[in-house]
Amino acid sequence: TNISSRQIQSIPSVSRSMNDVMLLTPQASSTTSGFAVGGGTYRGSSVTVDGAAFNNAFGIGQNLPAGGSPISLDAIEQMSINVTRFDGSQSGFQGGAINAVTKSGSNEWHASVYDYYTSEAFRGSKVAGEDVTNTKSLNHTIGATIGGPIVKNKLFFFVNGEYTFDTVPGSSSVARTSASEQWGSDVSANYPTVAQMDQMKEFLTSKFGYDPGRYQGYSLDTPDYKILARLDWNINDNNRLNVRFSHTHTYGSNQPSSSMSPLGGTNTALVAPDGTAISFNRYSAGRQAASALYYEAARYFQEQNFTSVAAELNSRIGKANNMARVTWSHQDEPRSYVGSFFPTVDILAQDNASGN
């Protein structure tokens, strides 16, 4: 399946990801982690841009690096999805081969400016008749492209830049205003009360000088940007060289880890101060369950940096054609936190541990 730039621009895509474009091939399917083809998994296929690998080397999360959107769709000239590849150069994977080619400059000048916007105003405030927390959120993407000649008929350039002002909601749950208020997974209120959360925050601030942050009704800024530059050089009638550089930086906010229960494994036998045995389950009474509530400082940020460089020399020697390609990709995903360093502390109340 071959997809042109015009088709790419006509596809409705909220995430502005290559995965949305890949779904145009009949054998494709969509998973929670990205594109799959021919009944395989999302890890089975290989994605390249100008011949450089654009796969998520980290091993978890999306099939593509940088949160699933490592390159702007406005920088792509065309894409191809090969379900049954036979080229020996396409090896090291079992699924389909997806390759995108970036735009290049020409003797004519071309430029574009684009803007995409969505916010919490586009969401409803009720589910099944119940009010839900509608915290401030924003996703505002602005970008531009420009391409043209540096030396006519000889040297051309293309540049794309994109910036996203992204504000994401924090915890969607709120504390109960009183101990008699209803709580649970079917309402927005969790078990802890406002008085309990405020009391603990005051204790941490006065005793240790540590501010754990907010626990409800807050949002976090997670901006990201993409840049791409490409040069095309017609060296002579027999040799053509193109070099492409791209870099993407995303910044995502995550809830505290729920892979472990606060005091042990999946099911842990605890003993309350009065000697009562308690069965603790991280799914029903863990850090993200309805029986708990966490402060803003318990969240963590996951930065996702992806850099790619590709250079290709096409030569004609007599009746023979030769292509030499060199690519380099680098993926870096450091973690950072809100506020100052402080140990992770889980506070387990006796009536809270059992989820009652």
Segments from the language model and where they lie:
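Membrane-embedded beta-strands that build the outer-membrane beta-barrel scaffold
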Residues: 37, 47, 81, 100, ...
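Periplasmic N-terminal accessory/gating domains of Gram-negative outer-membrane beta-barrel systems
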Residues: 1-104, 123-130, 139-148, 164-168
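Substrate-binding clefts and substrate-entry loops adjacent to catalytic sites
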Residues: 119-136, 205-210
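Outer-membrane beta-barrel proteins
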Residues: 10, 67, 86, 120-124, 130-134, 166-171, 216-217, 252-256, ...
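Extracytoplasmic loops and strand-loop junctions of Gram-negative outer membrane beta-barrel proteins
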Residues: 3-4, 60-63, 80-82, 126-130, ...
